[in-house]
Curated annotation (Swiss-Prot):
CDD domains: PoNe_Nuclease. It comes from the Bacteria. GO terms for molecular function: nucleic acid binding. InterPro entries: Restrct_endonuc-II-like (IPR011335), tRNA_endonuc-like_dom_sf (IPR011856), UPF0102_YraN-like (IPR003509). This is UPF0102 protein Nther_1376. SUPFAM superfamilies: Restriction endonuclease-like. The lineage of its organism: Bacteria, Bacillati, Bacillota, Clostridia, Natranaerobiales.
Length: 119
């Protein structure tokens, strides 16, 4: 399985996880030009949440959430501003940035961590 399909699988796991917690998925893979993409955008209790999904198959390179550094955070904030400009019906919502970290080291069951208000 290549990295792109691993990422899509992780996003699917994250989407199912969030739906099971009562979140409403608004967009998946919101992309603007070459600036990048936001994995998931969802709503929960009048909060608009921009979600970055990271996964690892081992801890050799660290925890999955450690891959969301300052540069990636800045990129996500820019994309969120563009999204809010494009879809102004969400301007009254509170905004939050979450990270879903998935560790799947070839076990039947993966470990999912939901870091709310991660940055």
């Amino acid at each position: 399985m290549n990295n792109k399909s691993k990422g899509r699988t992780a996003e699917k796991i994250a989407r199912i996880f969030l739906l099971s917690k009562g979140y409403q998925i608004i967009f998946q893979n919101y992309r603007f030009s070459r600036l990048g993409e936001i994995d998931l955008i969802c709503c929960f209790d009048n909060i608009l949440i921009f979600v970055e999904v990271k996964s690892r198959s081992s801890l050799l390179w660290g925890q999955p959430e450690e891959a969301v550094g300052y540069e990636k955070q800045g990129q996500l904030k820019k994309l969120a501003n563009i999204f809010l400009y494009e879809f102004n019906e969400f301007t009254e919502y509170q905004i939050r940035f979450d990270v879903i970290a998935i560790l799947n080291n070839n076990k039947v069951k993966c470990e999912i961590s939901h870091l709310r208000d991660a940055f």
